[in-house]
Amino acid sequence: IGGGKNSSGATNVNISGGEVNASTGYGNGGAGIGGGKESSGATNIEITGDALVSAGSSGSAAIGSGESSTGETTINIHDTNPEKGVKSAFAYGGAGIGSGRYAKGKTYVTISNASVSTLETPAASTNTSGAGIGTGYGSQSNADITITESTVKAVGGTGAAIGSGSEGDVFSPPTGDPNTFKTIIRITDSNVTASSGPSAAIGSGSYSTNATEIHINGGKIEASNYSGSAIGSGDSAKGKTGIYITGSNVTATADIGTGIGSGTSSSGETTIDISGGTVTAMGGGDGYDGSAGIGSGSHSTGYTHITLHDGVTVKATGGGDSSHGGGGGAGIGSGDRAKGNTDILIKGATKVTAKGGSTAAGIGSGNGSNGSTIINIEGGTITAEGGGKENGFCQASGAGIGSGGNALNKTTINIKGGEITATGGVSLDSRNHSDKWLSGAGIGSGSNVSGETEINISGDSTIKSASGGKYGGAGIGSGSYSGSTPDSKKGAVTINITDGTIEKATGGGEYVPSSKRWYSGAGIGAGLNAGTTTINIKDNAHIVSA
């Protein structure tokens, strides 16, 4: 239904009633409803009222523009009556609702007070490379997607469920410059369920070069994916990503990728700003690598900025179980072996609970992170636990707040307010036919860390409890075996306490019968077999118990 191949005139389709089933066959290249293949004219589609629509296509969009089209596309689905709207819209290569494969015209999709589903039957992901709602595979265009007061169920594959399509794969990566085009997604007061594969569920497709901006205000969001991010960028995406969530009820989970943030092996800069509402985010892992709950994916290289403020309640869990000897991602922070820098700001009346994946920090860096990490806590109630597992395969432990195990670059922790409870992780590494017990600090470094750590505690902060992992992590300071190299600068820890109250700082202490020794760390200072530690306590510092 709509325009023909190579058409240059505008195509206008208005559906306000009846039951419509429209699809095109393989190789046709035209939309099920909308523009024809290689058309240059504008495409305008309106679906409203008593319309019940199902559409499909191959190459083009199911509802939208044709393959390789260049005209602007505007789709408006609004004010549908109960049990009406879009029942299904699925395309191979093109978007379900949006633009066709290789399309170059700008795409506008508006869904308001409507019911929309891209698949008739539930599925976690598909094998399509176009977005469920957004742009098709290899699209070179800007896109604007607005969802208001609607119920939407969208499924993606290598293309996002809601956002941009894929632009390639490991064998044929995209050659375009990052951020040339931009996808903007606005979701307001809606009930949205989105799932995908290597792409983001809400955000960019795998190997996408598009810049992506995501605004979620109010409503309920359930997003899940495989190796991209549930909300953010896709696997190996290169574009810049901004994620802004306000007053929403959000659940974001991933099998290997990030809950909220950048996808695995992505390289674009990522900004995450979350205020108000309730957010649950879980990163994934496969035993080799884990990604952050909120932050960056494993092996990512882009800079990540995270701000949590204004009363948001957050529960974030990093991925990675170390079952194959790999590392984990932070609850909030970076993924396993991420190379990009990370800064984290928590302020206001926030409530944060964060747990690192095995070997990763609760709040801070993932295992083997090679980027610098800056953590600023200015308010809120914070509970953080470092990751670790006593399964014989876990190579390190993460700090509650600070660095993950094996971190290579500097970590700076500035605590100026809030109430903090932090616990270091505990691990057992038996991979080399001998047992090695490891622990991270409550606040400070993980185990086996060679990057420097600086801890600054001031202002009206209250450390309710800082507990090192039981095998020799410091309460505040270093994890076990951190900085235990001939180079005194590697893994060095500096602790500056100038104000605030430390109610309890406890080093880990455990007797291990098989090794016939105690594993102990300081309350404030060095962990077991750790390197250089400098402690400065002055001014109005108040230490109750250490």
Positions of the model-derived regions?
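Surface-exposed loop/turn motifs in large extracellular/passenger domains
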Residues: 1-25, 33-56, 63-91, 97-129, ...
